[in-house]
């Protein structure tokens, strides 16, 4: 057990006074080369380390390492900012005073529909049926009249009578048409009530050719041969095109990325200067750069690269330029890229963006649309200071879009700083946790030191040997490396990805995994959010995540396309996860998952939970038979014990009676022998021997 114990405890050598002097750390070369000491954890804000000393230790080591890098670089160029660590930099940006600036107006509304009611907020839940409104035009009937015969008056009278009859028929037809129109109006009202949910007058884009969408979006969907939009996209596109701020939540793989990328097309085209022809000279005017119009903030580098790859088709079709910047690679290359491309859409992680703003390479004063992808992660405590600095660089009337798979109620107050009324809250599915019914989920309660063997046994099952893509998630890099060595010794080929490795290698590993050149990947939460790989069949939580929201993000990586049949998720839980057992089991029940009875029994025994479960008929019969046998055995044992007790009592009573009678006789014989001093010695020895037999009584 000692070898599995975490070596980072309160007695760690970094807490010794000889290693800490004047808030500085003195480390040997071997300690600096040891990655396991320098990099403790890669999960969300080091939540896995509960003791404050460990946070201080990590901070001291990082500062020392940072000083060494600055000395090597020479101090002219600042060190790179890792966007995943909020404590990696100390930059304070001055917010722009937009009140003193005459801000140019911009078009927000691109929805081809009636205006929205003036109320504080809207909330869309669930789905509606597809309805198409058809406007029928009234056709006028024309009749040809014969030429009048002046000499034949009778014919004229007959014609007049025929005309009167025709007029009567026309009147009857008109009445029938009016009745049909009234019926159609009633039908249209019913359709409008269903097409515009909750009386909000925001339609649903059932197809890419819906009337509510602008022509630029229709052209985009036509050229890309876009299939039927997902349920989330049907609601999200019209909602964003209204120009209002929006919070959107839906399960992983529901098309949230394209849900906010598509409305950017009309938003940018309305402000991009295309350099049209001069009316007088007929010459083409040079294009003028309008600045960054849309900013997309993402929590991880991998998600930023994925979003950027989805914007390339927009650049090809409409000439809207996009760029992505993130930490982990050279800033000079990104600066050259920004100066060359001059993007209208910028995708970035918070840390690198703040550094670029401070150095004067990025100006956000022209941004009119702000997107927070994975908003629940972005609005967590560690990143809020960075986001507030970025928000101070953007005009206050910008349209803000917050999308995520989960958005707990605890973040509603925080989101008020980013959402202006009237706002729209779009929710498809559960209020906090998405539905993952399409994924078969199972769990096992196990001791921590038994998890490695259990993982190897699990990976040796047929479903994992078929070379189906599998991701194994860890909370700590140290544990990931240890398990990786064990798997290599067991001849199980795999790749590993975590925060320590270079960005180029991380990109290569993701491309290798997505192209099926490798099928087993060990990872931290670095790819637990937003990364879209179509054909992932299995998810294994070697370390159970520290929240159910993160569990949904991890498990949601599987089964994101029709190619994947029967995706599965398996989780190991230990005693340290006891605080999540009850909500996790309730979540599985809400998902209609078959929870194993041994798992529930162990939870009841170890954690004192009171989970109820029903056994199958076969198991019930077996248990009933066992109970009957046990009852019979207990009855036989009880009877046997009673008989033994009775026999013991009888034996003891008989012996006591014999002893008492013998004792009386012996006393009488002794009294008679007192007068007779010359008694036989043989008789005395016999009486002594008899007395010895009854001494035990």
Swiss-Prot record:
Probable ATP-dependent RNA helicase. The gene is ddx5. GO terms for biological process: nuclear-transcribed mRNA catabolic process, nonsense-mediated decay; rRNA processing. Residues 450-603 form the Helicase C-terminal domain. A motif (Q motif) lies at residues 189-234. It is an enzyme of class 3 (hydrolase). Its main location: cytoplasm. PANTHER family: ATP-DEPENDENT RNA HELICASE DBPA, ATP-DEPENDENT RNA HELICASE RHLE-RELATED. The Q motif is unique to and characteristic of the DEAD box family of RNA helicases and controls ATP binding and hydrolysis. It comes from Dictyostelium discoideum. Residues 152-190 have a biased composition (Basic and acidic residues). Residues 140-151 have a biased composition (Acidic residues). This is Probable ATP-dependent RNA helicase ddx5.
